[in-house]
């Protein structure tokens, strides 16, 4: 079974957590695109969605799903998003699509975080296969990069990428993240960092994994 089929399988399984008349938090990325597609099949049963990126907002509108601002809601029942890596404790690295800050904002509104992935995203230690994205204020890029080197990382500027918030991304290689919660806090305290792609303080509640053998739910 190919990767896209596994992503579609996980996306389809996430529909079981969608409650009638609710507003759904929606992340961004290729697996979320699959979820938006299947969400369109039940659009008459929900009020709408809050999107974590402009790209997801456009896809939702194309499906005929009303999009609300995060400022329009006081809370969300569920937030559905993918991950670039996820460990057994349901902590993640996210931000391959540069939407990490808005993803954290929308995730923080939700009672339940549902992560949908294919099996290639499962790792024992975060940072094993994927660089850690960090959103940085442009004027602080070099300063933050020096700090990341001092912490043992190898930052690379993601060229020609500007986030929806007008900032830049540094991708940090060679971080083996043994204590994700502490690392998330430490990096967020660096002057000039908007946020980093570790989702440990707000980890997933339910993980739906598309595998060659079928869908696996970790709750």
From Swiss-Prot:
<feature type="binding site">
    <location>
        <begin position="94"/>
        <end position="97"/>
    </location>
    <ligand>
        <name>substrate</name>
    </ligand>
</feature>
<dbReference type="GO" id="GO:0006014">
    <property type="term" value="P:D-ribose metabolic process"/>
</dbReference>
<dbReference type="InterPro" id="IPR037171">
    <property type="entry name" value="NagB/RpiA_transferase-like"/>
</dbReference>
<comment type="similarity">
    <text>Belongs to the ribose 5-phosphate isomerase family.</text>
</comment>
<dbReference type="Pfam" id="PF06026">
    <property type="entry name" value="Rib_5-P_isom_A"/>
</dbReference>
<comment type="subunit">
    <text>Homodimer.</text>
</comment>
<dbReference type="GO" id="GO:0009052">
    <property type="term" value="P:pentose-phosphate shunt, non-oxidative branch"/>
</dbReference>
<feature type="binding site">
    <location>
        <begin position="81"/>
        <end position="84"/>
    </location>
    <ligand>
        <name>substrate</name>
    </ligand>
</feature>
<feature type="binding site">
    <location>
        <begin position="28"/>
        <end position="31"/>
    </location>
    <ligand>
        <name>substrate</name>
    </ligand>
</feature>
<feature type="binding site">
    <location>
        <position position="121"/>
    </location>
    <ligand>
        <name>substrate</name>
    </ligand>
</feature>
<protein>
    <recommendedName>
        <fullName>Ribose-5-phosphate isomerase A</fullName>
        <ecNumber>5.3.1.6</ecNumber>
    </recommendedName>
</protein>
<feature type="active site" description="Proton acceptor">
    <location>
        <position position="103"/>
    </location>
</feature>
<comment type="function">
    <text>Catalyzes the reversible conversion of ribose-5-phosphate to ribulose 5-phosphate.</text>
</comment>
<comment type="pathway">
    <text>Carbohydrate degradation; pentose phosphate pathway; D-ribose 5-phosphate from D-ribulose 5-phosphate (non-oxidative stage): step 1/1.</text>
</comment>
<dbReference type="GO" id="GO:0004751">
    <property type="term" value="F:ribose-5-phosphate isomerase activity"/>
</dbReference>
<dbReference type="InterPro" id="IPR004788">
    <property type="entry name" value="Ribose5P_isomerase_type_A"/>
</dbReference>
<keyword id="KW-0413">Isomerase</keyword>
<dbReference type="GO" id="GO:0005829">
    <property type="term" value="C:cytosol"/>
</dbReference>
<dbReference type="InterPro" id="IPR020672">
    <property type="entry name" value="Ribose5P_isomerase_typA_subgr"/>
</dbReference>
């Amino acid at each position: 079974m190919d990767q896209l089929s596994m992503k579609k399988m996980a996306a389809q399984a996430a529909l079981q957590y969608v409650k009638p008349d609710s507003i759904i938090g929606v992340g961004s990325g290729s697996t979320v695109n699959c979820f938006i597609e299947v969400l369109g099949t039940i659009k008459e049963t929900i009020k709408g969605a809050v999107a974590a990126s402009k790209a997801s907002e456009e896809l939702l509108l194309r499906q005929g799903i009303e999009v609300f601002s995060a400022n329009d809601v006081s809370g969300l029942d569920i937030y559905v998003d993918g991950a670039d890596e996820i460990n057994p404790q349901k902590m993640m690295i996210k931000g391959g699509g540069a939407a990490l800050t808005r993803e954290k904002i929308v995730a923080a509104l939700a009672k339940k975080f549902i992560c949908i992935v294919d099996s290639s995203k499962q790792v024992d230690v975060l940072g094993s296969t994927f660089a850690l994205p960090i959103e940085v204020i442009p004027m602080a890029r070099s300063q933050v990069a020096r700090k990341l080197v001092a912490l043992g990382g190898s930052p690379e500027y993601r060229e020609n990428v500007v986030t929806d918030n007008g900032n830049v991304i540094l991708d940090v290689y060679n971080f083996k993240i043994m204590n994700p919660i502490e690392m998330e806090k430490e990096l967020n305290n660096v002057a000039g960092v908007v946020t980093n792609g570790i989702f440990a303080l707000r980890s997933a509640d339910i993980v739906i994994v598309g595998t060659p053998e079928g869908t696996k739910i970790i709750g």
